[in-house]
UniProtKB/Swiss-Prot annotation:
It comes from Homo sapiens (Human). Residues 1-31 form the signal peptide. Changing residue 228 to S: In FD; uncertain significance; decreased enzyme activity. The gene is GLA. Catalyzes the hydrolysis of glycosphingolipids and participates in their degradation in the lysosome. This is Alpha-galactosidase A. Changing residue 213 to R: In FD; uncertain significance; decreased enzyme activity. Galactosylgalactosylglucosylceramidase activity is stimulated by saposin B and ammonium chloride.
Length: 429
């Protein structure tokens, strides 16, 4: 989808100011003391693939309805997605009824969700999965449904009562940056006060960047992950723009990420229509390097075996979920090549080499292994395994060695480097 328009509406300012004042004075209220998202969250989210399709009469298989989510839940279990780590089934915008109920609570659209969110959550939980839901900090959601402004506490409690496990909180329709920040903080505190473990996914910095640089130290205190840049769409142009933005701003955003709080470059669009195979490999590899939340947005009923195998690749997922929790970064670029690297636990490193050229055939790229992993990854030597586009063992490399790879246009080679000193210690143990 296009970047959701953060249209500014008057009317929330005074009430938000009051809500902010009373919430900060509550004794013992602590922001995001929830112990969640110790590794990047994984799951499925409807937006990029299904958007805001409300026409269940003409398109019953792709409209936003309980049927869609129940079918996805079934497939997440039966087709190995849950076992691979994808545990959150997440509803995005357009699930709500046009108005709140008589007691001011959000309610699901009665035609598309006739049994309500609580029963859907029960079904999802019965599958061993967790349920995510969507709301907005302002007067309306980005699609025009009721927003949470003025209702932060009641909405947080409603989600907890329903058994929701994750909240994606968008940033449309609020009237100032100050009120935007107050709203995100208030909802974080409100979720904590419910006593239920609810992952808090924010879009706070996304709506700040056009006007001022976000304070990521503060954002991390309130959010489990946060969107920074424009919404992804099913195109190579979109993937490139996200990587370019991330590398340009990496000095500001990389170090703040870690267990409990992650930069979110948006959904995985692997298995859809717009990316070539090599471009899908690039997205999977770089989302692992960036320690990104892995939220697929695709149709699990109609996904190719190749895309499924890529999304369920246990070695790549292990890099994404590495317990050290350090986000990777771009090491170098030039001649249409980029090298990204990420430190891993056990003195290991992940390295991704991208061929950004969009013409011609595969190109060779050679790099000194001494330049990788801050000079220590292969000191005195390392064992290198290629994980993508196909897995193969490349063998031992000394610190003085040079590594040569052939990379397809718009494709990526993903490597794992294991220091031989650490490998010897493992063997001894």
């Amino acid at each position: 989808m296009q970047l959701r328009n953060p249209e500014l509406h008057l009317g929330c300012a005074l009430a938000l100011r009051f809500l902010a004042l009373v919430s900060w004075d509550i004794p013992g209220a602590r922001a995001l003391d929830n112990g969640l998202a110790r590794t990047p969250t994984m799951g499925w989210l409807h937006w990029e693939r299904f958007m805001c399709n409300l026409d269940c009469q003409e398109e019953p298989d792709s409209c936003i309805s309980e049927k869609l989510f129940m079918e996805m839940a079934e497939l997440m279990v039966s087709e190995g997605w849950k076992d691979a780590g994808y545990e959150y089934l997440c509803i995005d915008d357009c699930w709500m009824a046009p108005q709140r109920d008589s007691e001011g609570r959000l309610q699901a659209d009665p035609q598309r969700f006739p049994h309500g969110i609580r029963q859907l959550a029960n079904y999802v939980h019965s599958k061993g999965l967790k349920l995510g839901i969507y709301a907005d900090v302002g007067n309306k959601t980005c699609a025009g449904f009721p927003g949470s402004f003025g209702y932060y506490d009641i909405d947080a409690q409603t989600f907890a009562d329903w058994g929701v496990d994750l909240l994606k909180f968008d940033g449309c329709y609020c009237d100032s940056l100050e009120n935007l920040a107050d709203g995100y903080k208030h909802m974080s505190l409100a979720l904590n006060r419910t006593g239920r473990s609810i992952v808090y996914s924010c879009e706070w910095p996304l709506y700040m960047w056009p006007f001022q640089k976000p304070n990521y130290t503060e954002i991390r205190q309130y959010c489990n992950h946060w969107r920074n840049f424009a919404d992804i769409d099913d195109s190579w142009k979109s993937i490139k723009s996200i990587l370019d933005w991330t590398s340009f701003n990496q000095e500001r955003i990389v170090d703040v990420a870690g267990p409990g709080g992650w930069n979110d470059p948006d959904m995985l669009v692997i298995g859809n229509f717009g990316l070539s195979w090599n471009q899908q490999v690039t997205q999977m590899a770089l989302w692992a390097i960036m320690a990104a939340p892995l939220f697929m947005s695709n149709d699990l009923r109609h996904i190719s075996p190749q895309a499924k195998a890529l999304l369920q690749d246990k070695d790549v997922i292990a890099i994404n979920q590495d317990p050290l929790g350090k986000q990777g970064y771009q090491l170098r670029q030039g001649d249409n090549f980029e090298v990204w690297e990420r430190p891993l636990s056990g003195l290991a490193w992940a390295v991704a080499m991208i061929n950004r050229q969009e013409i011609g055939g595969p190109r060779s790229y050679t790099i000194a292994v001494a330049s990788l992993g801050k000079g220590v990854a292969c000191n005195p030597a390392c064992f290198i395994t290629q994980l993508l586009p196909v897995k193969r063992k490349l063998g031992f490399y000394e610190w003085t060695s040079r590594l040569r790879s052939h990379i397809n246009p718009t494709g990526t080679v993903l490597l794992q480097l294991e220091n031989t000193m650490q490998m010897s210690l493992k063997d001894l143990l």
